[in-house]
């Protein structure tokens, strides 16, 4: 059996947000992420679940270098990416993208869809013909029409805007996408469509996802493994079935009790 390829690793990740007191002395305001170890494999979806404020979005941003971690090590394809090495971070980020929670605020309201999709291509310094090819392909992958490229974000529904956000993430051909609660701001009727689209794209393109959410039913549907976060720590980790059928932590069982139809397996 072929060994899985580890694409991203994190060891001992900590993120502390500081504030200064009246005298200007720095003190801890929030210890958002504490001693987290995590591995992500090629073609895998790793689900991060937990209640609001548990640190899952902060952890995701630390892993992608969007937030500077306080402590810990990150490895991309086995090579350490030091937190102060901006060149290495940018090189890693060339292969990473993010899909934001709110499709309304994450798109520039003054740009057309074409301008939104061109923005991440600027660093690649492509020819106009190459840009055009990538834009057409990105629109096709998320089932948006060619005519949509000339429209502004306000002309679209929430689900369509999230498709634009997905196209923006895909256009640079990333290896990893952080899906930061990508369906929580959408109508329930649209959520399944977006999750199915993400699953199809993952299978077609071999993408690796970090999928943060508080909806455990959706996380189970899309994820291969799940990490349960509480107060900045991953308190339980495992494949979907072991987490759902035989949770070890009381906190995990509490989260699962809110899932319709969940019943703890006894014995």
Ranges and model annotations:
Residues 64:
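Helix-to-loop junction immediately C-terminal to a conserved catalytic motif
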Residues 72-81, 92:
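Conserved ABC transporter NBD signature motif
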Residues 129-147, 256-257:
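Conserved ABC ATPase "signature" region
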Residues 152-156, 160:
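Conserved ABC ATPase signature
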Residues 173:
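Conserved catalytic motifs of ABC-family nucleotide-binding domains
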Residues 237-238:
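ABC ATPase "signature
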């Amino acid at each position: 059996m072929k060994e899985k390829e580890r694409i991203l690793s994190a060891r001992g990740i900590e993120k502390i947000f500081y504030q200064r007191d009246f005298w200007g002395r720095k003190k801890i305001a929030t210890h958002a992420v504490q001693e987290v170890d995590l591995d992500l494999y090629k073609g895998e979806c790793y689900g991060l679940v937990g209640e609001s404020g548990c640190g899952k979005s902060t952890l995701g941003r630390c892993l992608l270098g969007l937030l500077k971690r306080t402590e810990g090590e990150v490895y991309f394809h086995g090579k350490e990416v030091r937190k102060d090495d901006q060149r290495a971070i940018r090189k890693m980020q060339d292969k990473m993208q993010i899909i934001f929670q709110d499709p309304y605020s994450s798109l520039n309201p003054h740009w057309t869809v074409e301008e939104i999709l061109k923005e991440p291509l600027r660093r690649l310094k492509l020819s106009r013909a190459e840009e055009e090819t990538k834009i057409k392909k990105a629109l096709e992958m998320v089932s948006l029409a060619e005519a949509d490229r000339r429209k502004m974000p306000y002309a679209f529904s929430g689900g369509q805007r999230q498709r634009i956000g997905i196209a923006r993430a895909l256009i640079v051909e990333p290896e990893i996408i952080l899906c930061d609660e990508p369906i929580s701001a959408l109508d329930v009727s649209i959520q399944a469509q977006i999750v199915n689209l993400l699953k199809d794209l993952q299978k077609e393109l071999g993408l690796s996802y970090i999928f943060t959410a508080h909806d455990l039913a959706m996380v189970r549907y899309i994820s291969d493994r799940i990490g349960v976060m509480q107060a900045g720590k991953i308190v339980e980790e495992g494949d979907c079935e072991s987490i759902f059928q035989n949770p070890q932590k009381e906190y995990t069982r509490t989260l699962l009790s809110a899932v319709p139809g969940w019943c703890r397996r006894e014995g």
